């Protein structure tokens, strides 16, 4: 079954894959990393001007990493928002996805957190650096293959 967003992308010959609908009826689409930035710009122009959230997850140990974007479009009133979920999968060895910071400013800290926890590099992000972990931290703590260190010394802030 094809949703409204998928039908619109097909009409404009934009490459994607429909992953169906979640329990709330929100359509989920898969976009390739190399197509993501252009589709993000087009989605913004189409009316998806609110990035509700961005997150990431590890699909499987040794598998792909995913960056997930929840976009909202309000056309007929605030009580009837149109939402879409976009998933962009990247290989674990070199996870690179174009940043959407320049489209939706709210992606700033969210992409930084995904970088900090999963090691996904967001190309053209203006301040892509660790946000939760110390700069000296080694590894990506939320990856399924991450091995936690036995000891980590945190220096006093005073």
Curated annotation (Swiss-Prot):
Top-level class of the enzyme under EC nomenclature: translocase
The organism of origin for this protein: Ceratophyllum demersum (Rigid hornwort)
Keywords tagged on the record: Chloroplast, Membrane, NAD, NADP, Plastid, Plastoquinone, Quinone, Thylakoid, Translocase, Transport
Record carries keyword Transport: yes
Cellular localisation: Plastid, Chloroplast thylakoid membrane
Molecular functions (GO terms): NADH dehydrogenase (ubiquinone) activity; quinone binding
Pfam families given in the database record: Complex1_30kDa (PF00329)
Protein name per its UniProtKB record: NAD(P)H-quinone oxidoreductase subunit J, chloroplastic
């Amino acid at each position: 079954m094809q949703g409204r967003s998928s039908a619109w992308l097909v009409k404009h010959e934009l490459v994607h894959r429909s992953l169906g609908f979640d329990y709330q009826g929100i359509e989920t689409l898969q976009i390739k990393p190399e197509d993501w930035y252009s589709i993000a710009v087009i989605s913004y122009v189409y009316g998806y001007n609110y990035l509700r959230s961005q997150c990431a997850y590890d699909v499987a140990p040794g598998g792909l990493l995913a960056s997930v974007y929840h976009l909202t479009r309000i056309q007929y009133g605030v009580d009837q928002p149109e939402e879409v979920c976009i998933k962009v999968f990247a290989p674990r060895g070199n996870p690179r996805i174009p940043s959407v910071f320049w489209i939706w400013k709210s992606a700033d800290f969210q992409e930084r957190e995904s970088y900090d926890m999963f090691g996904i590099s967001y190309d053209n992000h203006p301040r892509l650096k660790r946000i939760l972990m110390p700069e000296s931290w080694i590894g990506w703590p939320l990856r399924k293959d991450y091995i936690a260190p036995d000891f980590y010394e945190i220096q006093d802030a005073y």
